[in-house]
Regions:
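Conserved catalytic-core motifs of GNAT/GCN5-like acyltransferases
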Residues: 144-147, 159, 164-180
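Conserved GNAT acetyl-CoA-binding A-motif
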Residues: 134-146
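Short hydrophobic/aromatic beta-strand or adjacent loop that forms the aromatic wall/cage
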Residues: 77, 180-184
Length: 190
């Protein structure tokens, strides 16, 4: 097995800056993580404006205590973080609707990994954690997500995780006067 593949299998990742290997830990976030989550979320919205709905201005106006509420795990929402030591380097969320007829479905949202940590299978580990949570904690049998038409890397990642495109919403988002389509993807768990 290639050393990088072996490290990824052991949950270790290394930033692409050539620094020594780091151990990446994936865990459920809570209110205590609000400040570091907010910092990563603002970087995500700033560096990938076509991948996130809020603008940087809109998201930067959200106070830390509101992020704390959003991060508190419930029966309908959970957010996971990837940590290099104490530093949050990646995030994703999963939510579902508790109404009985659609409680079997959950939606993955907000997948982001800091640029220096990409290519180390961290996004896959975050998706695995969110998927396991939806299946095991909530009994979900189906996951959905959306990906912007220009984010080919993310779409390939989602396809490699078993997601299949099932539809496209034309002109779903307008960024700086340009319209973008959103692809809807689904994964059946059971």
């Amino acid at each position: 097995m290639h050393p990088a593949t072996a490290a990824a299998a052991r949950g270790q990742a290394r930033p692409s800056t050539g620094t020594p290997p780091m151990t990446i830990t994936i865990r459920l976030l809570d209110a205590a993580d609000a400040a570091c989550f907010r910092a990563v979320r603002l970087r995500a919205v700033d560096t990938a404006p076509t991948s996130f709905l809020p603008t940087l201005d809109e998201e930067s106006q959200v106070p830390v205590d509101e992020f704390a509420k959003r991060l508190t795990p419930t029966q309908v929402q959970a957010v996971f973080g990837a940590f290099d030591g104490e530093t949050l380097v990646g995030i994703t969320g999963v939510r579902r609707d508790a109404r009985t007829k659609i409680a079997h479905k959950a939606t993955i949202w907000g997948v982001y990994v800091d640029a220096a940590y990409r290519g180390q299978r961290i996004a896959q580990a975050l998706l695995d954690s969110a998927t396991a949570h939806a299946a095991n904690a909530w009994g979900c049998s189906q996951l959905m997500l959306c990906v912007n038409e220009v984010n080919h890397t993310a779409e390939r990642l989602y396809a490699s995780q078993g997601f299949v495109r099932f539809g496209t919403e034309p002109r779903s988002m307008c960024v700086d006067g340009r319209f973008y389509d959103e692809h809807y993807m689904i994964k059946t768990l059971a």
